[in-house]
């Protein structure tokens, strides 16, 4: 073997072996238990970042561990390759998105291979290829035929200068990012998929996701947002019109003092015809980009419409106000306002001088609404026939009265809205719908799929090439002239079913059901928690759609989910002559000074600039604190980077990048290499004979098998990879101190090293692969079995007992493992140190904690 550890040399050799032998290519095998391990696939942005490396190292550790458990392991990889960044890069680089994307894929593919990830590259997919999106288009047409797809107008960001739709991230301070024109809201027709048809099932099945983090499940429950309430009908004074309002607090209905409606509500439009102030307010609201998330913090404003609503029970008239905090696309676009018992309504009423009435009070006292609304549930009062009822009784009594009088109905509502999948961008999968000459909209026939996205285009930064090219949209269906849809799919469409396509990526159908049902559901899914309410919800929804289409037979797409934490790094900047911050890479920091707690107090970069240190922040381009994985691999080797990633932090928590920690990981691998090379250089012909072992040799062997047990549990069940590494490091300390004098000494070291190679194989596979063979093991380590704990080795012949006198440790004694209290007490009392501390004292009490502690109380 090589005497010195040379990572670049051994990693190249091992990776060539994996490639030549197609080590990680798998097929279905009914005789083997399968394990499908999947990390969320990357967007091909150009280079891997450390967040990718952490995600994919975790996945690779799990996959390799399961392989050594004897399972048939699938670990695929691909590219989430449609999306807006490619369009922006194409505009900036004066190229088309396709070549930019494919170049990035090749570059990042090589980076993944350098890190030694054990992917089945024969299953590689890129979502921007027709071979992939053809089946997405086909499935969309099937959903349309089932009534799960529809088209309706919805609001978008519109640049009137460029006459184009803008993504939210292209709106900067209310203006177009390109020409600085104020952005307007415009209603245009868009395609939707009825995710709400699955809302109840998506919510209920969260309870079956035992292997998912509670935080993700809670976020999805809240996002789906099931509520039970009453939808009631209000009349409009002086008009024959009515409108509906939904509430989860019908117990407060008797306290309604005004009604708030969205600026886009039909009643607001009617009132605006004779109310210039209201008309101006409506225009202002329409041209603002208020999201649901912004409602909580923005200033609440409104204008009286001059209309009055008729209370459905009392018949009393209350004013109708148009308000900016009511959204037309959420609920009915109208809310009943009870300022006595809702803080937002209270603040609005105070601002505009509207009435505030209390109708709910605490069970054990009076209510004070002079300074703030009373928002708790309680007892109804000032509520006529409903006085004295508690929340539940009041809810039911008022609901029953509304239902009986035909003015309301009980209803379950969801916060979840149907999924708008239309995007007015170019670099996405074309939506496979056409409009015939007579205006009829139909799906593109299956024999005309895929609807190809032209890749040889010029990006002008203003309009999508397929919208600008009027000829592209022209087609024929069944001999009739037709126009293609020029919108493309939301890129969440591609990432909602890619996991299933990996099961049969070359199939001339969306999925091969036999293969899909062999591999699915995914056994372990790995990705960031930021995807909890978008990707992970669409992922679950799509799986149910695939199930109902007869393509898969499971209810959920993934059994277990691990959400890894972010990678942080030091961030530094200086102020340049223009007064602007210039962020400096940690790699360009020349010197630092630290206080006695290790905190950076001063830093200077390579150009002599004194820097401001802002602490550990998420690695990002904006703060220039990203560390290029490739630089680290070239400097230390892939195994070192992988080992640091697994050792530095539990997987769900943030990881602080410290090059000193990387250096420590590198030193550990070199120690392992040195120990193995020293062992290999000796005569190791004597086989292990447990019957010949001394007590010291048995103790060392016990450490080996305790480590096997701990690492197996840490990786397999707990997924605490950092403590698994720590356990092996501790074992290494024992092995380095152990003598290699006798044949049995060396036999134990040999057994230990053989185990260590397999324990570390998931984390540092190149080193483990190489040393496994150098140690004389037959066959490749990939085909070996995970080490098994020898339970007999864990049995201790003796125990080390701590002896305390009056609470202070005075001695440590070795006793037989099965020694009883009397014999332990006798040995302890006769220890020379104990005798010394008991001199002149009378023993009052002796407490024995079996196998651990002998405590003597004396005075």
UniProtKB/Swiss-Prot annotation:
Record field: catalytic activity: tRNA(Leu) + L-leucine + ATP = L-leucyl-tRNA(Leu) + AMP + diphosphate
A GO CC annotation given for this chain: cytosol
InterPro entries membership: aa-tRNA-synth_I_CS, aa-tRNA-synth_Ia, Leu-tRNA-ligase, Leu_tRNA-synth_edit, M/V/L/I-tRNA-synth_anticd-bd, Methionyl/Leucyl_tRNA_Synth, Rossmann-like_a/b/a_fold, tRNAsynth_Ia_anticodon-bd
Cellular compartments annotated: Cytoplasm
One GO MF term attached to the UniProt entry: ATP binding
Amino-acid positions noted as binding ATP in the UniProt annotation, renumbered to this chain: 621
Keywords assigned by UniProt, alphabetized: Aminoacyl-tRNA synthetase, ATP-binding, Cytoplasm, Ligase, Nucleotide-binding, Protein biosynthesis
Enzyme class: ligase
Pfam families: Anticodon_1 (PF08264), tRNA-synt_1 (PF00133), tRNA-synt_1_2 (PF13603), tRNA-synt_1g (PF09334)
PROSITE patterns: AA_TRNA_LIGASE_I
Motif window: 'KMSKS' region: 618-622
Example GO BP: leucyl-tRNA aminoacylation
EC number(s) stated in the UniProt entry for this protein: 6.1.1.4
Segments carrying motif 'HIGH' region: 42-52
Family designation: Belongs to the class-I aminoacyl-tRNA synthetase family.
Designated name of the protein: Leucine--tRNA ligase
Gene encoding the protein: leuS
């Amino acid at each position: 073997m090589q005497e010195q550890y040379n990572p670049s040399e051994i990693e190249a050799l091992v990776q060539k072996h994996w490639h030549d032998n197609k080590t990680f290519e798998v097929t279905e095998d009914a005789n083997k238990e399968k394990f499908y391990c999947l990390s969320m696939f990357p967007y091909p942005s150009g280079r891997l970042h450390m967040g990718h490396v952490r995600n994919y190292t975790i996945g690779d550790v799990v996959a390799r561990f399961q392989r050594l458990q004897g399972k048939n392991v699938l670990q695929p990889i691909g590219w989430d390759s449609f999306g807006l960044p490619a369009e922006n890069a194409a505009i900036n680089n004066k190229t088309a998105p396709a070549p930019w994307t494919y170049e990035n894929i090749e570059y990042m593919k090589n980076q993944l291979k350098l890190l030694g990830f054990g992917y089945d590259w024969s299953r590689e997919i890129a979502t921007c290829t027709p071979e992939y999106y053809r089946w997405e288009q086909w499935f969309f047409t099937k959903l349309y035929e089932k009534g799960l797809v529809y088209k309706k107008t919805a609001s978008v960001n519109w640049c009137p200068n460029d006459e184009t739709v803008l993504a939210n991230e292209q709106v900067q301070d209310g203006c177009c990012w390109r020409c600085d024109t104020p952005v307007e809201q415009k209603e245009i027709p868009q395609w939707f998929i009825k995710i709400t048809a699955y809302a109840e099932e998506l919510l209920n099945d969260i309870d079956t996701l035992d292997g998912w983090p509670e935080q993700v499940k809670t976020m999805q429950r809240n996002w789906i947002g099931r509520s039970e309430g009453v939808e009631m009908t209000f009349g409009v004074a002086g008009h024959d019109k009515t409108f509906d309002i939904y509430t989860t607090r019908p117990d407060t209905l008797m306290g309604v003092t005004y009604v708030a409606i969205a600026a886009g509500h039909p009643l607001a439009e009617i009132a605006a015809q004779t109310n210039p102030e209201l008309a101006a307010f409506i225009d202002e609201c329409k041209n603002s980009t208020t999201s649901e998330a912004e409602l909580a913090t923005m200033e609440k404003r409104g204008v009286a419409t001059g209309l009055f609503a008729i209370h459905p029970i009392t018949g009393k008239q209350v004013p109708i106000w148009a308000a900016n905090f009511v959204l037309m696309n959420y609920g009915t676009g109208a809310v009943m306002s009870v300022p006595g018992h809702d803080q937002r309504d209270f603040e609005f009423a105070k601002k505009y001088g509207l009435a505030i009435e209390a109708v709910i009070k605490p069970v054990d006292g009076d209510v004070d609404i002079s300074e703030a609304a009373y928002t708790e549930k309680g007892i109804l009062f000032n509520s006529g026939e409903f006085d004295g009822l508690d929340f539940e009784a009041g809810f039911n009594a008022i609901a029953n009265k509304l239902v009986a009088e035909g003015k309301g109905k009980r209803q379950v509502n969801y916060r979840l809205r149907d999924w708008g999948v239309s995007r007015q961008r170019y670099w996405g999968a074309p939506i496979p719908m056409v409009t015939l000459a007579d205006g009829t909209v139909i799906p593109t026939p299956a024999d005309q799929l895929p609807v190809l996205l032209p890749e040889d285009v010029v990006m002008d930064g203003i309009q999508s090439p397929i919208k600008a090219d009027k000829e592209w949209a022209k087609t024929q269906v069944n001999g009739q002239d037709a126009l293609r849809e020029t919108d493309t799919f939301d890129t969440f469409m591609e990432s909602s079913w890619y996991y299933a396509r990996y099961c049969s990526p070359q199939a001339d159908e969306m999925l091969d059901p036999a293969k899909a049902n062999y591999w699915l559901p995914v056994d372990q899914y790995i990705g960031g928690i930021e995807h909890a309410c978008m990707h992970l919800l669409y992922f679950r929804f799509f799986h149910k759609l695939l199930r109902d289409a007869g393509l898969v037979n499971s209810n959920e797409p993934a059994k277990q989910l691990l959400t890894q934490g972010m990678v942080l790094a030091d961030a530094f900047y200086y102020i340049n002559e223009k007064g602007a911050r210039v962020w400096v890479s940690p790699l360009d920091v020349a010197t630092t000074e630290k206080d006695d707690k290790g905190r950076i107090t001063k830093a200077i970069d390579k150009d002599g600039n004194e820097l401001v240190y802002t602490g550990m922040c998420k690695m990002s381009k904006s703060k220039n604190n990203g560390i290029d994985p490739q630089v680290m691999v070239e400097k230390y080797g892939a195994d070192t980077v992988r080992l640091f990633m697994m050792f530095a932090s539990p997987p769900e928590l943030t990881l602080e990048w410290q090059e000193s920690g990387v250096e420590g990981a590198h030193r550990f691998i070199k120690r392992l290499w040195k120990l193995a090379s020293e062992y290999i250089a000796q005569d190791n012909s004597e086989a292990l004979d447990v019957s010949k072992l001394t007590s010291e040799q048995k103790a060392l062997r016990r450490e080996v098998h305790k480590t096997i047990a701990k690492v197996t549990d840490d990786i397999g069940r707990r997924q605490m990879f950092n403590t698994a590494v720590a356990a092996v490091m501790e074992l290494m300390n024992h092995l380095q101190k152990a003598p290699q004098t006798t044949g049995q000494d060396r036999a134990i070291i040999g057994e230990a090293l053989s185990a260590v190679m397999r324990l570390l194989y998931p984390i540092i596979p190149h080193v483990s692969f190489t040393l496994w063979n150098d140690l004389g093991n037959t066959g490749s380590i990939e085909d070996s079995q995970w080490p098994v704990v020898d339970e007999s080795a864990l049995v201790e012949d003796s125990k080390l007992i701590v002896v305390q006198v009056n609470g202070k440790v005075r001695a440590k004694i070795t006793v037989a493992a099965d020694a009883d209290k009397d014999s332990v007490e006798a040995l302890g009392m006769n220890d020379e140190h104990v005798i010394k501390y008991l001199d002149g004292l009378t023993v009052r009490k002796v407490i024995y904690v079996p196998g651990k502690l002998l405590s003597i109380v004396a005075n």
